[in-house]
Amino acid sequence: MKNENLQEKIYAVIDLKSFYASVECVERGLDPFKADLVVADASRGSGGVCLAVSPALRAKGVKNRCRLFEIPRDIKFIIAPPRMQFYIDYAARIYEIYLKYVSKEDIYVYSIDECFIDLTSYLKFYALGAKEMAKMMMDEILKTTGVTATCGMGTNLYLAKIALDILAKHQDDGIAYLDEELYKKQLWTHQPLSDFWRIGKQTRLKLEKCGIFCMKDIANAPKSLLEKIFGVDAYITIDHANGIEPTTIAEIKAYKPSTKSYFSSEILPRDYERCEAVIVLKEMADRLALRLINKEVKASGLTINVRFADKLEPQQRASMRFKTPTNVSSVLMSAAEELLLNKIKNVGLIRQIGISANDVVKENLTEFSLFEDDAKEKAVLKSLNLIKEKFGKNSILRAIDLLPEATGQDRNKKIGGHKSGE
């Protein structure tokens, strides 16, 4: 028998529509639904990626994350350079709006332009329906910032996210709701599967080769087949196929991973030869060392990821374990170089590289180095950190940062890989 005291959960996930582009339109006194505007770094040339396109351009078929040259030539549009710190400030103002209505314990910030909110305990307090409460917050966001929001609602976090991603954009008020029954009625046979959260294009193609085209197919597929495709995530996917997600915001916030890693990735300004990419990768390893020292931790291993200019070439990855955990710059730089030159197959020009410090442990839990040179280098790196914190990241540079292929100086002016606008 169902416990009458158990209140059914109601979650909302609010998305700020074409956030960066909308902010740039508002700041120019333009209507995002009428102005053709993209946020992109024009200095990267016609191949520069558009971080956001205005709703007006989206309505004309221009896709988000396209490259500048992919926009039809007959469309005249504004190119707004990215200002990441400015967008962060805008997002903080919007977060303050949420806090007027709900506690921070009931908010999970998923990204700069998207957050989950547990509305369950507030509906009775405000004497409002779930849609009414969501609309109240969305209206205040629009009134205060000029940014339009859309909202997905559901009886669990997954259903709220799917309602947002697939249904909300088709609703006049920008709000859509799903429970398990509605999910199966409206979306169980929806195609393509890549429209669903956590299923990418490559996974969709694998599923289609196995005769699986929709969530209903996943729900009825042999578990052994799904385990081969999804690995340890198979049972999460099966739950999602049935509209089930037991995880709560409180559980997400309380979660602490058993191991920690530090990762950074960089899209190169042009296609790089392998010998050129090594320079950027060593810069990234050096910055990673500074980051580890600043956090007083060491890495037990290192991984690099490489994406090639030829999109048909699959991404390559290579890893290395250290005999003892380290945060020494020269060790990380040497390891990164060895992985790229000796472990990554040379199949063509490189467009994107990533580096990750794996299984990070506290510095005081590891053995001290017996080598005086390591101790000296760490002392130098700590001094470098202090100088950079006080005078800026470009106040002191390595010789490698001055090479023509290097990207470190430019990256130091960015937030999340994009220009801060400062």
Residue ranges and their predicted role:
Residues 131-192, 354:
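Long, highly charged, low-complexity intrinsically disordered interaction regions
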Residues 23, 318, 322-422:
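Acidic, metal-coordinating catalytic segment for phosphate/diphosphate chemistry
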Residues 1-112, 116, 241:
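Residues that scaffold, gate, or flank divalent-cation-dependent active/transport sites
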